[in-house]
Amino acid sequence: MKKNISRREWINKSATVIGGSFLGSMIGFSPLKGASLLKEPVRMMYNENPYGPSDVARRAMRKAFSESNLYTMRAALSEFKNLIAELNNVKPENVAIGFGSREILNKAAIMNGIDGGELISPTLTFEAINQFASKTMKTNVVRVPMTKEIGIDLKTTGQMVNSKTNMVYLCNPNNPTGAIMNPKELEFFCKETSKKSIVFVDEAYHEYVMDKKYRSMVSLVNEGYDVLISRTASKVHGLAGLRVGYAISTPKIIKRLNSYMNGSLNVVGLRGAIASYKDKRFQKFSIEKNNEGRTIVTDYLDKKGIEYLESQTNFIFIKTGIDIKKFQPAMEKH
């Protein structure tokens, strides 16, 4: 992989391209062929999982329809919350369940905005919380430039934290670059910065990471640091359309976050998520197929001499060599 390119070139002449898990098959695990997939263009920007939901999750959801005439969401919600707590070695009071991780992001922006503080975020990252914070909450979002390697600059971010800062948003692995941060540097940053403001670490692509050096920041919650972690059932579990996500943080932050939740979850989605998080076989398959698909794409890029960043996710950030304003309409033609 070539690396001798400038940050300006990457930002001005790059696009995110999915290296999706588009390979076929194992009995019971085949790419979905719904009408939307057949009639609509390939939606590369959503990083969807073509294999999910698993058969186990689908059976659980079909069964859940028998209780859909009742207000049974609370029982399912409690069960899912307890499961997530168990899987992550935290207590149920450390967990909040959201209508996808997007609700977690939005409610965190509300929480930050009500306090009247600033939000610090990298210039190249997942924009949901930044857009909601600036447009809906009128929050001042302070942007931190990327490093020369298109990485998140933790040192500069730490230097920009001041008395006005209420929250720092970091995505690890980052979207759209697919890269992870140095675990020791991230842990140090979280420990030091959380003494001054909440550190929000978006781990939406957590399950896809193959780098053995990677480390989730969930363990810091048990140590009492004001760190907020978000994750989603939309990627590895293939439940994007059912909107299930969760947050892990201190009981104080979780309690406040829950006070802004809309209560939009449904029993079918929750039952599907419960079954899927217990279905280790499908998770393993989903991750393996993603790795195979990503390797096919990177091998092709290497063969063609196309520059890209090493990805730990189900998408790849490449240098197209074409201005993004020309690249997008060109893609629409295909």
What are these regions (language model features)?
Residues 54, 226-302, 306-309:
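PLP-dependent aminotransferase class I/II
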Residues 111-170:
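PLP-dependent aminotransferase-like
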Residues 1-21:
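N-terminal secretory signal peptides and thylakoid transit peptides that target proteins
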Residues 91-95, 117-118, 164, 203, ...:
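Short acidic capping loops at alpha-helix termini that bridge into adjacent secondary structure
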Residues 79-118, 136:
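Phosphate-binding glycine-rich loop
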Residues 14-70, 86:
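N-terminal "arm"/small-domain region of PLP-dependent enzymes with the aminotransferase-like
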Residues 154-163, 176-199, 203-236:
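Active-site pre-lysine segment of PLP-dependent enzymes
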